[in-house]
């Protein structure tokens, strides 16, 4: 039994993998703004709770926000969403404190590995994943393994430039909300979020439909550029708004075909949507653990 923990900027999800199945446990607030916040102390409290109930655990698999040195199990870089997180020695601390093997990897890397564990992807040798949320995240899987780069930053696509702007400013949920808020009547601006936009778009709201098409244009341009460079078998799209599959799939596929101009390299890439939701990171963390600590 392997404990799985998914560390995000606002919440920490927990569970365990046993016999290839995920059992979800409690979710804890990250609460990084509280006085004397310590991620290691927070994890200790969580692991104390879990191990009190499941003392038979054989290891700990972590998925985490930030740029992760998976070899050392440390946070190579993190922004101030989690203050003081950069440099945190996650694996070394857990292994020394609990005498359990530990693995750590980036959250989008783990999400991709979780999705690729599904039976439909068992023969896939190359894949990309993009997650659309507050920002835009990415992960790269080539020749049957995650590609992380020499500084563990492969997939940090939020810094990519589309039409002179970082992609996060034109293809994230945050960008979509800002686009719509600027254009709707001020009496409804406080209501505008991703769910509201899609509900209104489905009801025929022209500005919301226009905003989604604006996002899709930029996102699909980014996908075409990435696919042209790496020629993956599949691109998997995840994140909250990508759950709107019925609305987004035809828009994205149509724009993708329009942009790729029928070239062979792009025509053979499948555009897929994530299926595991919030479970992907924990399942993928387990997949990374198995590679680092083979039985």
What do the PLM-derived regions correspond to, one by one?
Residues 122-174:
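Glycine-rich phosphate-binding loop of actin/hexokinase-like ATP-binding domains
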Residues 30-32, 83, 154-156:
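A short acidic/small-residue loop/turn micro-motif
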Residues 80-83, 103-109, 129-131, 272-278:
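Active-site nucleophile and cofactor-binding loops and adjacent substrate-binding regions
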């Amino acid at each position: 039994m392997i404990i799985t923990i998914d560390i995000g900027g606002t919440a920490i999800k927990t569970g365990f993998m046993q016999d290839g199945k995920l059992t979800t446990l409690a979710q804890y607030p990250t609460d990084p703004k509280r006085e004397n916040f310590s991620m290691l102390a927070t994890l200790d409290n969580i692991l104390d709770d879990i191990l009190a109930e499941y003392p038979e655990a054989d290891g700990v698999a972590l998925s985490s926000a930030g740029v992760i040195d998976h070899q050392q199990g440390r946070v190579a870089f993190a922004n101030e969403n989690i203050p003081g997180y950069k440099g945190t020695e996650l694996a070394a601390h857990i292994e020394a404190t609990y005498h359990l093997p530990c693995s750590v990897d980036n959250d989008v890397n783990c999400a991709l590995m979780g999705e690729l564990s599904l039976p439909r992807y068992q023969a896939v040798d190359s894949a990309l994943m993009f997650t659309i949320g507050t920002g835009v995240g990415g992960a790269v899987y080539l020749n049957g393994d995650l590609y992380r780069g020499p500084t563990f930053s492969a997939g940090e696509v939020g810094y990519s430039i589309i039409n002179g702007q970082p992609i996060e400013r034109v293809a994230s949920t945050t960008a979509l909300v800002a686009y719509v808020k600027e254009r709707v009547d001020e009496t409804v601006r406080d209501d505008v979020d991703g769910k509201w936009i899609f509900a209104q778009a489905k009801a025929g709201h022209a500005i919301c439909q226009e905003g989604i098409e604006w996002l899709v244009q930029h996102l699909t341009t980014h996908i075409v550029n990435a696919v042209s460079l790496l020629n993956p078998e599949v691109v998997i799209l995840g994140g909250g708004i990508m759950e709107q599959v019925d609305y987004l799939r035809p828009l994205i596929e149509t724009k993708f075909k329009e942009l790729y101009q029928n070239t062979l390299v792009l025509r053979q890439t499948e555009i897929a949507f994530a299926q595991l939701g919030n479970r992907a990171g924990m399942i993928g963390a387990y997949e990374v653990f198995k590679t680092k600590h083979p039985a």
